[in-house]
UniProtKB/Swiss-Prot annotation:
One of its GO terms (biological process) is DNA-templated transcription. The gene is rpoC. The keyword Cell wall biogenesis/degradation does not apply. Keywords: DNA-directed RNA polymerase, Magnesium, Metal-binding, Nucleotidyltransferase, Transcription, Transferase, Zinc. Belongs to the RNA polymerase beta' chain family. This is DNA-directed RNA polymerase subunit beta'. Disulfide bonds: none annotated.
Length: 1323
């Protein structure tokens, strides 16, 4: 078998008949499979042992040779080679066909490759292949030309003969008529009798003339057809063809079926055809040119690849190894078999029958029918159902053909090659493990024992608990007490990987150090839940064990949970306190008055009556007061601190030279807040204030930016412990009694009900219409809901647990409290419109039957939406991964001078709109500017260089840029990166997950796809109704899909193609807009613009208004409401314009949902969408006009052409949707495993495509290490040099090398001496 590590590319091509015979070990001649009595394969059948190898290891079929000693011998009795039965997975056979057949992929695929090659319409081709029409394969032009006069004379003679016969017949008939009339005359017949005879004679004579005329016409047709006869001419009329064959068979050859096609292909001159097609392309126009271009693609593919086009017509077909199409016996003695065996059996039966008919010399019509059936059976074997009705098995189920085995989710690619199951894994339910450290997980003992079984067995033998592996295995299975101690050692410092499906981003798999626990559930650290999106309501997780030292090192260094605190999408920490922990820390840092519980012992000023109270000389003293019950946790106090750093302003004031540990300062704070600050690093400035979720996030973000990961991990762990501790002690729980109901709610609702009645009366009197009533009622009841809600909010005291949970940011929001205690308010129906009767009750009071019914519409739609969204989001992620999977950081710096211009800050204006000289951050700088390298010096407002080119922008640099008033910067971006495949580290910038410059080998494409796809489920499915807009404005997930697929939006808006003033003309149903360009060029007119869609709005000075006559518009500005078409944006604004448009539009959708994603992730996908260009003029290059090529390849080819004095290639930028871009990838393996498998493979085979194995998918498919991370080529040849201590420790193993390792008396006893490696040459 091939070793995947010994080849660098994989090529696919067309197999010729000789190739198929060379692969084969013998011909399958019989349709039989297994003898049902002996259960042995039939000789020459589909499972024949002589062809495919023995069914039992080292044993021939007849049993003459058994055992391995006869290896390689071929039995003279049964002809079976003595070898391993595994060869039945590799050895192929073949079927010699009695008549050639076409390969359905090349004939029936779209476009039909055979049709393009031979210039035949697919319909005509089908008629020929399936014996419904004849085709001329060759014509002897010279012979026809030289004999034409003779043949013409013969034809004229024949025509003359026909005419003479006609005349003779007519004369005879006329004579007979005269005689008949004379007889009647003599007999004195009446006139009508004579007339009858006359009419009959006339009719007969007319028939004679018509017959002769038809005969002459037929002869003319035969002659004209013969004179114009040309190769590839189809003759559908069977009798005409027979006549031609009778008369002129020496001058032409023809036929029907695949044989005729085979003859045409063999006579086909590819080079001459290519030349004539190029001529047509040069001189032709319109459809003719287009067809020539398409045909040239196919012809050039065969020329370039060296494939023999005859491979599209098969003389023999391969039979795949029997183990890949097995037949197994079921319990009842019946057999279950693969569908392929049925399909092969049909082919063999029909083939044998055809052979027999040919031997018997059967009539041509019967033979042709049998050939057609053979063709159909081969079609069904290759691709069942592609043409006509599929062949069905029992129960009318279509049989699975070879193509079906590759296609779809259950096909070979996605099911077996990209979705392998792995050993050393287990799964169980997860429960919370609050006592764990961030890098730990609790592993059930039984599961750990099974996972680490080989390691435990090895240790048991090493420690002499067991004599050999077999007894060690028995000990493990019986769970002897010694096993548990050994297991503890085996798992020490051996990380395991936990995974929760669905793995939406890379933090869905993380490594943890296992801690053995009782029970059968896996314990998960509470802070890891956010990344896994896990909760403890029955979720399950899988455990995987990294085996090799390299895998363990990767798991520990790269995947350990404590090293993966930041989100790769936005760079924000994910391991944050949540839920109970947030409530606990919020409670800890609250401040309470003296009279409240928890506020006792608060600070009071010194008076004449006595000294100040609530002042403490040290933290210890305050804690002692708290323990005695004198001081409350949340009471404001003054305390002297010397072990925590003071806030920045206190430090600046009291310690100008900087604070040192041990220096004291007085804090006005609470005991709880001091305890909170003790959880943070000692040199982090003291944090004062109530710590709700937002503030906690600010602190942790700050820590992540300024401290090493290990410190952050320890800090969040401490916060988790304190959070749980104080949440328990705060007594925050929810009971029915905590839900307070508004006492005067009924009165409020009665007021609004009266207003609603007034609106209904207005409708009845015709003062308002239906839509105005609807809008008025919706507004009224929304106002009522808000009023009730706000009243409820005021009703709750601060110490009520429900608002406490909401205010701390742990869970829920105020609107949920309104629903719980106020009123539910307006609900929607399944169409998304409001039901005008609101739900007036709260959940505390309970809903009435009608209210419950109304409410269930919207709830049901919500659930259905969620289900649809999950599937759609998953499919989007799959397409994104596919398009970006080969974007890997390949080099440190591509050296480009290009970059993108980004906004950093905006001037702050005063009330009069004048500049104040100060600057504020521009919107969204965190997701656009941070983490990038400067491509040019950043110049401040005063002209000084603030940051030089090549600086990476972090929080500090950003603050400097804003302070200096740098409004825009030019930064490096993946969209302008010069690296041919993948991107360079400098253009990508900092990795969001580490905060450092991205390393070479990082799979940034997949990280980008995951970052965009992972929040996809949170996006809404809804399309928004905007009043008066033609159709709906798409939003949420469908909008993201529309953008990435580069589709024309539903409510498409035209965009201004020039800068200029706008003139609006308004007729009944449409607008006509005219732009008068600033540069005085020709006016641009946009006609028939829908009024329903409405004019675009302009935002001026915070006020939005529609476009007006005389307004100035900029190039690229939308003229109507709706969305711009990306293809239009590309045409008007160019590549850079459309890139920015797509990024802004995608970000708009995510920002609406409050999801932070860095622009660079979207940039990577957009870069892949704009990678290809269309060749308009090929210049001096090899490209065909109209073909899609890689932009970087086109640039390289142009440079090469110009060097040699040629013309460069002329191209047009293209924007491709992600599905199309995935299928247009260089790698045919990756494209075939994505979608349209058969089409991709057909195309790849004709072009003899070579897969360079650059991306990730293609390497996974063939089983190689992926070329990313540590698997990239530059890291592959690293040698590890062990230290002497490591060598000694690693090799203290039982060994049989020479003396000295074992005592002389007890041979086989282990002495524990280390193996001297130097003598063995192992290093």
């Amino acid at each position: 078998m091939l070793d995947v590590n010994f080849f660098d590319e994989l090529r696919i091509g067309l197999a010729t008949a000789d190739d198929i015979r060379r692969w084969s070990r013998g011909e399958v001649k019989k349709p039989e499979t297994i003898n049902y009595r002996t259960l042995k394969p039939e000789k020459d059948g589909l499972f024949c042992e002589r062809i495919f190898g023995p069914t039992r290891d080292w044993e021939c079929s007849c049993g003459k040779y058994k055992r391995v000693r006869y290896k390689g011998i071929i039995c003279e009795r049964c002809g079976v080679e003595v070898t391993k039965s595994k060869v039945r997975r590799e050895r192929m056979g073949h079927i010699e066909l009695a008549a050639p057949v076409t390969h359905i992929w090349y004939f029936k695929g779209v476009p039909s490759r055979l049709g393009y090659l031979l210039d035949l319409a697919p319909k005509d081709l089908e008629k020929i292949i399936y014996f419904a029409a004849n085709i001329i394969t060759s014509v002897d032009e010279d012979a026809r030309h030289s004999d034409q006069t003779t043949l013409e004379a013969e034809m004229l003679l024949e025509k003359k003969e026909v005419e003479q016969d006609r005349d003779a017949d007519l004369a005879d008939r006329a004579k007979t008529l005269e005689e008949d009339l004379a007889e009647l005359e003599a007999a004195g017949a009446k006139a009508d009798a004579k007339k009858k005879v006359q009419n009959a004679a006339d009719r007969e004579m007319r028939h004679i003339r018509e017959r002769a005329e038809r005969e002459v016409e037929r002869l003319d047709e035969i002659w004209n057809t013969f004179v114009k006869l040309a190769p590839k001419q189809m003759i559908a009329d069977e009798t005409l063809y027979e006549e031609l064959l009778d008369r002129y068979e020496d001058y032409f050859t023809g036929g029907m079926g695949a044989e005729a096609i085979q003859t045409l292909i063999r006579n086909f001159d590819l080079e001459a055809e290519a030349e004539s097609l190029r001529e047509v392309i040069r001189d032709g126009k319109g459809q003719r040119k287009l067809r020539a271009l398409k045909r040239l693609k196919v012809v050039a593919a065969f020329l370039r690849s060296g494939n023999d086009p005859a491979g599209m017509v098969l003389d023999c077909i391969p039979v795949i190894p029997p183990e890949l199409r097995p037949m197994v016996q079921l319990d009842g003695g019946r057999f279950a078999t693969s569908d392929l065996n049925d399909l092969y059996r049909r082919v063999i039966n029909r083939n044998n029958r055809l052979k027999r008919m040919l031997d018997l010399g059967a009539p041509e019509i019967i033979v042709n029918n049998e050939k057609r059936m053979l063709q159909e059976s081969v079609d069904a074997l290759f691709d069942n159902g592609r043409r006509g009705r599929p062949v069905t098995g029992p129960g009318n189920r279509p049989l699975k053909s070879l193509s079906d085995l590759l296609k779809g989710k259950q096909g070979r690619f996605r099911q077996n090659l990209l979705g392998k199951r792995v050993d050393y894994s287990g799964r169980s339910v997860i429960i919370v493990g609050p006592q764990l450290k961030l890098h730990q997980c609790g592993l059930p003992k039984l599961m750990a024992l099974e996972l680490f079984k080989p390691f435990v067995m090895k240790r048991l033998v090493e420690k002499s608990y067991a004599q050999n592996i077999k007894s060690a295995k028995r000990m493990v299975e019986r769970q002897r007490p010694e096993v548990w101690d050994v297991l503890e050692e085996a798992i020490a410092e051996h990380p395991v990987m936990l995974n929760r499906a669905p793995t939406l981003h890379r933090l869905g798999i993380q490594a943890f150090e296992p801690v053995l626990i009782e029970g059968k559930a896996i314990q998960l650290h509470p802070l890891a839940c956010e990344a896994f999106n896990a909760d403890f309501d029955g979720d399950q997780m899988a455990v995987h064990l990294p085996l090799s030292d390299e895998a363990q090192a990767e798991a520990r260094i790269l995947m350990l949970a404590s090293n993966n605190i930041l989100s790769p999408a936005s760079g924000k920490p994910l391991a944050m306190p949540r839920l109970d922990m947030v409530t606990g820390l919020y409670y800890l840092t609250l401040i309470k008055g003296k009279e409240e519980f928890g506020g006792q012992g608060a600070f009071t000023e010194a008076t004449e009556q006595g000294p100040a109270t609530g002042v403490y000389t040290s933290l210890a003293e305050a804690i002692m007061a708290y323990d005695r019950g004198v001081l409350g946790l949340q009471a404001p106090i003054h305390v002297r601190i010397d072990h925590l750093r003071p806030p920045a302003e206190v430090e600046a004031e009291q310690f100008p030279d900087g604070w040192q540990k041990g220096q004291t300062w007085t804090a006005e704070t609470t005991l709880g807040r001091v305890q909170f600050n003790e959880l943070l690093p000692w040199n982090y400035p003291y944090v004062e204030g109530v710590m709700d979720k937002k503030n906690q996030a600010v602190v942790i973000n700050d820590l992540a930016a300024k401290y090493p990961m290990i410190t952050v991990a320890q800090t969040v762990d401490k916060l988790k412990d304190a959070g749980f501790y104080w949440a328990t002690r705060s007594g925050v729980t929810i009971t029915m009694h905590d839900v307070l109901v508004l006492p005067n709610k009924q009165e409020i609702l009665d007021e609004y009900e009266a207003k609603a009645q007034r609106i209904e009366k207005k409708l009845a009197r015709g003062k308002i219409n239906e839509s105005e009533r609807y809008q008025s009622l919706v507004d009224l009841w929304k106002e009522a809901t808000d009023f009730v809600g706000e009243s409820v909010e005021k009703l709750y005291p601060d110490d009520n647990p429900i608002p406490m949970i909401v205010k701390s940011g742990a869970a829920g929001n105020m609107r949920q409290i309104w629903t719980l205690a106020g009123m539910k308010g307006m609900v929607t129906n399944s169409r998304g419109d409001y039901i005008t009767r609101p739900v007036k009750t709260s959940f505390r009071e309970g809903l009435s039957v009608l209210e419950y019914f109304n409410n269930s519409h919207g709830s049901r739609k919500g659930l259905a939406d969620t289900a649809l969204r999950t599937a759609d989001s998953g499919y989007l992620t799959r397409r994104l991964v596919d398009v970006a999977q080969d974007v890997i950081v390949r080099e440190d710096d591509c050296g480009t001078k290009q970059g993108v211009v980004l906004d950093v800050c905006t001037p702050v204006l005063d009330a009069n709109g004048e500049k104040t000289g100060e600057f504020a951050r521009a919107d969204f700088v965190e997701t656009s500017v941070l983490g990038r390298f400067l491509a040019a010096d950043a110049i401040g407002a005063n002209g000084e260089v603030v940051c030089e080119a090549g600086t990476v922008i972090g929080e500090l640099e950003l603050a400097e840029l804003v302070k200096a008033g740098v409004e825009t910067i030019k930064a490096r971006s993946v969209m302008t990166c010069g690296t041919a495949t993948g991107v360079c580290s400098t253009c990508y910038g900092k990795s969001m997950a580490t905060g450092k410059k991205v390393e070479i080998g990082e799979a940034v494409g997949i990280v980008a796809a995951q970052s965009i796809g992972e929040p996809g489920t949170q996006l809404t499915m809804r399309t928004f109704h905007l009043g008066g807009v033609g159709g709906d404005i798409t939003g949420g997930l469908p909008r993201v899909q529309e953008l990435f697929e580069a589709r024309v939006p539903k409510a498409k808006s035209p965009i201004a193609s020039v800068d200029g003033k706008i003139k609006i003309e308004d007729d009944d149903a449409f607008f006509t807009l005219t732009i008068i360009p600033d540069d005085g060029s020709e006016e641009v007119v946009y006609e028939k613009l829908s009024k329903r869609q409405g004019l675009a709005t302009l935002g001026t000075g915070g006020v939005e208004r529609p476009l007006r006559d005389g307004d100035h518009v900029k190039m690229g500005q939308q003229l109507l409401k709706g969305a711009a078409d990306p293809h239009e944006v590309l045409r008007v604004m160019g590549r850079r314009g459309v890139q920015q448009h797509l990024i802004n539009e995608v970000q708009k959708v995510y920002r609406d949902q409050g999801v932070a994603i860095h622009d660079k992730h979207i940039e990577i996908i957009v870069r892949q969408m704009l990678r290809r260009v269309t060749v308009i003029d090929s210049g001096s290059t090899e490209y065909l006009p109209g073909s899609l090529v890689d932009h970087s390849d086109a640039v390289a080819a142009s440079k090469e052409a110009v060097k040699t004095g040629g013309r460069p290639v002329e191209v047009r930028a293209e924007i491709m949707g992600i599905t199309k871009a995935s299928l247009a990838t260089e790698s045919w393996l990756s494209a075939a495993s994505f979608q349209e498998t058969t089409r991709v493979l057909t195309d790849a085979a004709i072009n003899k495509r070579s897969d360079k194995l650059i991306g990730l998918k293609e390497n996974v498919i063939i089983g190689k290490l992926i070329p990313a991370g540590t698997g990239i080529a530059r890291y592959r040849n690293i040698q590890v040099q062990p230290t002497e201590e490591a060598r000694a420790a690693a090799f203290t193993l039982p060994s049989t090398f020479g003396d000295g390792f074992y005592g002389d008396e007890g041979y086989g006893e282990f002495t524990g001496a280390s193996v001297p490696l130097d003598d063995l040459g192992l290093h």
